[in-house]
C-alpha cells in the first residue's frame, strides 16, 4: 500500500464528491441558510504477527439547504455523501474494498456508522477456509494433501479467537 498509489484513489473519491456537491437543489443563499457537517478520517493498523497492514480512509459530508416549499414541504433538503476505502494486505493476500453512498431527503436522515477498520480486519482474519474434500483410503502417488489445523489447548478444546491480530488457523501442505 504505497502512499502514491493511495493518493490517486483518494483523488478519485474527492472528484466524485465534488461532482455530487456541484448539483445544488433549489434557489438559496449559501452564506445565509446552509448548514454543513464534514467528517473525515484515516485509520492504519499493523499486525506484526501476520505481517499484515490495513488502511481505511473515510469521509462523510452532510449539507442542509433551504429550498422553496414546492421542492420540499419542510422547506429544507438534506444531502449526505459518504465514501470509504479499505485496504488489507499481507504476504499471501491483498483485499481492497470501496463504497460510496449518497442521499437526498426532505427530512434529516439518521447517521449511518462508518465501518471500523478493526472490525473489518477481524472479519478478514476469521474467514473460514473452504472445506476440503478428502477421500477415505489411500492417496494417489504424487498428489498433495492439504490439512486444516486449528490451535488447541492441552485438553483438546479450540482456543477462542481474539481481536489481537493473531490468527489461530493455518493450512499446511503435506507431501
UniProtKB/Swiss-Prot annotation:
Region of interest (Disordered), ranges: 58-89, 103-175
Biased composition (Polar residues): 115-141, 148-169
UniProt-listed InterPro entries: Luteo_VPG
Chain positions found as Phosphoserine: 64, 133
Highest rank taxon of the organism: Viruses
Region (Homodimerization), start-end ranges: 30-47
UniProt remark on domains: The N-terminus is involved in homodimerization. The C-terminus binds ssRNA. The C-terminus is phosphorylated.
Protein name stated in the entry: Movement protein
Taxonomic source organism: Beet western yellows virus (isolate GB1) (BWYV)
Amino acid at each position: 500500500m504505497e502512499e502514491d498509489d493511495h493518493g490517486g484513489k483518494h483523488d478519485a473519491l474527492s472528484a466524485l464528491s465534488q461532482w455530487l456537491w456541484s448539483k445544488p437543489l433549489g434557489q438559496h443563499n449559501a452564506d445565509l441558510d446552509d448548514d454543513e457537517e464534514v467528517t473525515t478520517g484515516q485509520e492504519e493498523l499493523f499486525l506484526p504477527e501476520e505481517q499484515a497492514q490495513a488502511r481505511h480512509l473515510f469521509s462523510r459530508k452532510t449539507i442542509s439547504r433551504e429550498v422553496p416549499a414546492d421542492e420540499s414541504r419542510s422547506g429544507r433538503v438534506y444531502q449526505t455523501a459518504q465514501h470509504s476505502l479499505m485496504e488489507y494486505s499481507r504476504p499471501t493476500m491483498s483485499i481492497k474494498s470501496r463504497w460510496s453512498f449518497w442521499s437526498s431527503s426532505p427530512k434529516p436522515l439518521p447517521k449511518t456508522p462508518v465501518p471500523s477498520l478493526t472490525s473489518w480486519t477481524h472479519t478478514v482474519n476469521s474467514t473460514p477456509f473452504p472445506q476440503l474434500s478428502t477421500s477415505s483410503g489411500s492417496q494417489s502417488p504424487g498428489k498433495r494433501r492439504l490439512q486444516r489445523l486449528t490451535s488447541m489447548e492441552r485438553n483438546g478444546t479450540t482456543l477462542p479467537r481474539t481481536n489481537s491480530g493473531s490468527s489461530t488457523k493455518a493450512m499446511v501442505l503435506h507431501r
